[in-house]
Amino acid sequence: MKKMKILSFFILSLAIIIGIVYSRQCDDKCKQDYPYSSCNGNLNLYRGLGYDGNGNVIFSGKYNSSQGSGGFGLPSIFSVPSSGGCQLSKRFDIQGEILDGPGYTALDYFYKYLPQLDRYYVRFNQRGSPIFSIYNQTSNEIKAVFNIFNTPFVPAFSQNESAPFFVYGGYGIYGLAKYPTDRSDAQQAKLIYQSQIVNGLEIDGDQLYMTTYQGQFLKGSLNCLNCTKDQLQLLVTDSELASATSVSGFALTSDYMYFSYSGGIKGYPKNGDASRVRKLVSENVVAMISNGDFLYYQTDSGVVKSVSTSGNHPQVNILYTPVSDNQCQCSVGFSGDDCRQCDNGMVLWASDNGIPMCSPLNSLGKPKTCYAAYQCGSSPFIICNGTCTCLPGFSGNDCTLCGNGGEVIWENGYPTCVIQIKKIIT
């Protein structure tokens, strides 16, 4: 069986310090200075939730602009108390988005937060390819882990961080006795079950629970190695699960397994007893996680809620409803009262929405982020791939060095570094 195909991709490790996002109370001046500044509209939540082990639900999002269409500024990680109260706290901004050009990179999904490691697993859209990544909030580094393009990728993490185990579904189910941190980890993963494609996956001790596109709830073992999928135990089949366009979440409690979809949240006992099926909520759910006897979920309108799984009458509690914080923020990298200061930086303009960004210059006078090659200077040896980069084979500050004894071949005004391989005759 083939393991999940890991394609080569640009962002192996990217640390881009774009700058501080300045904010103040929204006023008429803020609106007049658009697009250099904007009053925040409602917070647009990205799909996915996490739990910090300290009574807070975590999610990601970006404020919409009240003047233009779409998001404005940097995306951020937020949290709200799981007990309710709608007290939103911003944990940190996420640097490194490149919203135009060949290096396009944008956050679009929140997978998991590991509190002991203080590690955030997220997904970036990088030039049309979804990248399963780690974001380091201390170094502002995006660390790409797996390229999951054209793969039915479903991750699952062991709850005990002291005994880490990671399982993922692709064209088969694979396991790692660690939490992944590098793209090479996919090559080290062991095949647990052949060919099985899932849309939900969870670890419970040394057992695996999963859902399929055919509406099946299956149970397996982490101790299996290269097992065939017919060795999985069928627990129950659900017609709504089979007909769902997509399963947005799969979660376990002490005695039940639940899935979320456009029709709500539904669950069965872990033994598959269909007579004890439960329908907790009946609204469009786009993300769901569990903690103890509570499920936390996100609706298609961005509302974050909790529902108790104990008792005969589930209690739903609203944790957060997307609203504006009435703040004015400068466009990324800009500062000053009119949000037009771009100190030691280059102004880049996004072609789709006309929003400027101030990209700091590096020690060579090149922007740390670029949208097009001309922003990197007039040298034909330098291209823009999100950052100003030497052409393949070239190196040096001006990118004119051609390997060890290489020859520069020019064609139609473009250089190519050609390394001659000499045969040694014995």
From Swiss-Prot:
Identify the species of origin.
Dictyostelium discoideum
So which domain of life are we looking at? Answer: Eukaryota
**Laminin EGF-like domain residues:** 325-348, 384-408
State the signal peptide span: 1-23
Q: Does the keyword Repeat apply?
A: yes
Induction note: Induced by srfA, during development.
Glycosylated position list: 64, 136, 160, 226, 385
Cysteine pairings via disulfide bonds: 330-339, 342-358, 370-388
A Pfam short name: EGF_laminin
Protein name, entry field: SrfA-induced gene K protein
Recite the UniProt keywords alphabetically.
Answer: Developmental protein, Disulfide bond, Glycoprotein, Laminin EGF-like domain, Repeat, Signal
- PANTHER family cross-referenced by the UniProt entry: PTHR32256, SRFA-INDUCED GENE K PROTEIN
Kindly list any coiled-coil regions of this protein. Answer: none
